[in-house]
């Protein structure tokens, strides 16, 4: 059966349900333990294969040159890999549009998710036949978070984020909010007060403890908007930072409870409600076509 041409592909958000910094390598990279879960919410990519080798991003993202955008870089990386390995699909280019809902610098993995969706979608649409492992290895060249999106299952990550173990945390509802600022990851990881000596623990131990993000204290100290947002959310539910920020999230057992709090939110709060899912919307879309 020939793969069906799918034009619309999800690029879901992720949350770091916890994030512990356990050390730092000599090359400066931080060692961590984190738990990734996807949201049933994110950007949408519309992809139309081309008969030539042009990669066209038809909806430029403000502040990002097209050739530097992870969407274009992912497509070109896949092209180059196919050429090197004498894989010559009949269709080898693409016109790509993005409907952008996830904030840049928000800690929701938007850019990494976009890259992963391009790798997975074009592998399918071009009929390249590459394995998930190969796509994940390509994704790692684009960013440490790309492989988890390629693999499409919630995961416990260790090392510098490259060692992934599938996990099945509870699928709760989340109120995710953006404080209106963008936080550059190096700003957090470069702070001398960042905790870098959290003990290494196994996943079972971590799942039975209160979830913490070691980056949160630094984000709250440096950005009053993050402090204000977390302080408000914590009045209603457990809440914390995702990634290095700037987005924060509060967890609820039901959609109704999450929406009740969002309905009470002050005007300055910009947020949405979404469900945590252990199988990503991208994986569900792909599985429905094979």
From Swiss-Prot:
Pathway info: Isoprenoid biosynthesis; isopentenyl diphosphate biosynthesis via DXP pathway; isopentenyl diphosphate from 1-deoxy-D-xylulose 5-phosphate: step 3/6
**Parts forming coiled coils:** none
Annotated catalysed reactions: 4-CDP-2-C-methyl-D-erythritol + ATP = 4-CDP-2-C-methyl-D-erythritol 2-phosphate + ADP + H(+)
GO molecular function terms noted in the UniProt entry: 4-(cytidine 5'-diphospho)-2-C-methyl-D-erythritol kinase activity; ATP binding
Catalytic residues identified in the record: 14, 145
What InterPro entries does this protein's entry cite? GHMP_kinase_C_dom, GHMP_kinase_C_sf, GHMP_kinase_N_dom, IspE, Ribosomal_Su5_D2-typ_SF, Ribsml_uS5_D2-typ_fold_subgr
* Family membership: Belongs to the GHMP kinase family. IspE subfamily.
Name of the protein in its database record: 4-diphosphocytidyl-2-C-methyl-D-erythritol kinase
The beginning of the lineage is: Bacteria, Pseudomonadati, Pseudomonadota, Gammaproteobacteria, Enterobacterales
């Amino acid at each position: 059966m020939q793969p069906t041409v799918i034009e619309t592909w999800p690029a879901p958000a992720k949350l770091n349900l916890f994030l512990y910094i356990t050390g730092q390598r000599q090359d400066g990279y931080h060692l961590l333990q984190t738990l990734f879960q996807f949201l049933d919410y994110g950007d949408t990519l519309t992809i139309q294969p081309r008969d030539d080798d042009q990669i066209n991003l038809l909806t430029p993202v403000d502040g990002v040159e097209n050739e530097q955008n992870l969407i274009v870089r992912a497509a070109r990386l896949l092209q180059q890999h196919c050429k090197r390995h004498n894989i010559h699909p009949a269709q080898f280019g693409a016109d790509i549009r993005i409907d952008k809902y996830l904030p840049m610098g928000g800690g929701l993995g938007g850019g990494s998710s976009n890259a992963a969706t391009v790798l997975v979608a074009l592998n399918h649409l071009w009929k390249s036949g590459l394995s998930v492992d190969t796509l994940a290895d390509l994704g790692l060249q684009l960013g440490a978070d790309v492989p988890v999106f390629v693999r499409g299952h919630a995961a416990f990550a260790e090392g510098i984020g490259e060692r992934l173990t599938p996990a099945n945390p509870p699928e709760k509802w989340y109120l995710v909010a953006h404080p209106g600022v963008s936080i550059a990851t190096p700003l957090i990881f470069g702070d001398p007060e960042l905790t870098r000596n959290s003990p290494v623990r196994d996943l079972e131990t971590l799942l039975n403890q209160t979830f913490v993000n070691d980056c949160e204290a630094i984000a709250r100290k440096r950005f009053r908007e993050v402090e204000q947002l977390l302080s408000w959310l914590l009045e209603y539910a457990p809440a914390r930072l995702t990634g290095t920020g700037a987005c924060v999230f509060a967890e609820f057992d039901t959609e109704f409870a999450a929406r009740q709090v969002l309905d009470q939110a002050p005007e300055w709060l910009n947020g949405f409600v979404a469900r945590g899912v252990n199988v990503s919307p991208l994986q569900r879309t792909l599985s429905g076509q094979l």
